[in-house]
A protein has these predicted regions:
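Bulky hydrophobic segments
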Residues: 1-136
Length: 136
């Protein structure tokens, strides 16, 4: 039987989701109308695409994937699916902003970042298991 996630793991994950929401959702300059023309539907298709932004978006979701996997170790792709859903939701809020622009590049980068975090957690866990018991 699988152990439930520790309280510490759940709190760490919830805090990171909070950080994502605080940073990504446009809490100011909210408009009563949408800007669907500003949505980048096809990843990497805008001339304004910046490698730096993509790298930062990817790195921003690495802790999300790592903490999700720590909290739910048996859910293989759960971190990627959860990151995709959270990222899609936060990008969607930007449709109502004059200063932010929703981007499928961001959603893809965030999902890849979560996958990297999940794999990093797996690699760390495998090393700890391979090292054998702590005989101190």
């Amino acid at each position: 039987m699988e152990r439930p996630p520790s309280r510490r793991a759940r709190i760490a994950f919830a805090l990171w989701v909070g950080v994502i929401l605080i940073i990504v959702v446009p809490w100011y300059r909210w408009q009563g109308h949408t800007h669907w023309a500003n949505v980048e539907w096809i990843p990497f298709s805008r001339p304004s695409y910046h490698v730096r932004d993509t790298v930062l978006n990817t790195l921003f979701y690495v802790p999300f994937g790592l903490l999700y996997r720590r909290m739910m170790p048996r859910h293989t792709l759960g971190a990627v699916v959860a990151a995709f859903l959270l990222s899609s939701a936060t990008e969607l809020t930007q449709v109502h902003s004059h200063g932010r622009f929703p981007s499928s590049t961001d959603v893809l980068s965030n999902s890849i970042g979560a996958w990297i975090g999940m794999r990093w957690y797996d690699a760390r866990s495998d090393r700890a298991t391979d090292a054998g018991p702590d005989l101190r």
